[in-house]
Amino acid sequence: NNCYSPNPGINDWYETVKINYGDSHTGTWDKMLDILLYWAGKGVDGFRCDMVELVPPEFMKWLIAEVKKNYPDVIFIAEVYKKELYGEYVREVGFDFLYDKSGLYDTLRTVVEKNVDDNGMPVELWQSATGITRNWQFLSDLQPYMLNFLENHDERRFASDFFGKDASRTFAPLFVSLYLNTAPF
C-alpha cells in the first residue's frame, strides 16, 4: 500500500520491500526475469503474483511474454482486487487466471459470516442469490479465467471458528465456488 511512514498502522505493509521497476525496461526487469526463468527451469509450472496492481502492468506483460518464450506451459495467476481491472489483466497483460477475491469470495463471505446487510437487517435467501448472480453476470466472458477459493494466506478460512463458526456452513459456498463458472479449478 506504499506506506513510507515511520509510524505505520496495523494495515500498512511497512515490512514489504518496494521494488523500483523504473519507467521502462531496467536492470530490475532483467533480474526478475532471471529469477522466474531459474525456477521455471527447475520445474515450477506456475507463478502466483501477489497484489499485482502494485506492479507496473507493462513490466508484467513483458515478463509473462519472456517467460512463455522458453516455457509456454507456465501458468501466471494474478491477485487483482479491482474488479474493473480484471479484463485488462487477462486480455492485455497476459495473465492466465485471476483470483476472484473482490467478487465471489467477498459475496460468499458476506452470506456465510454476517447474513445481514450493511444496515444490520437479515439477508434473505433471494438477496444472497442476487449478489451471487450479479457477480456471475459481471464476469461474463472472464469466467473461464477466474479462480474461486474459500481461503488463502490473506483471508480467514471459511470453516474456522473466527468465520463461519460451523464447518457445515461452508458446504453451500463450496458448491457455489465449484460449480458457478467454467474455471478449470
Region annotations inferred by a language model:
Residues 34-37, 45, 50-142, 146, ...:
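Active-site-proximal helices and loops of the catalytic beta/alpha 8
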Residues 22, 79, 102, 150-152, ...:
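Structured loops at beta-to-helix junctions and adjacent beta-edge loops in soluble globular domains
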Residues 1, 60, 165-167:
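Aromatic- and glycine-enriched glycan-recognition loops and surfaces
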Residues 13-29, 44-54, 111-124, 155-165:
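The substrate-binding groove and active-site-proximal loops of carbohydrate-active enzymes
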Residues 1-38, 63, 69, 86-87:
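Substrate-binding/active-site clefts of carbohydrate-active enzymes
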Residues 36, 133-185:
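Active-site-proximal substrate-binding groove within the catalytic cores of carbohydrate-active enzymes
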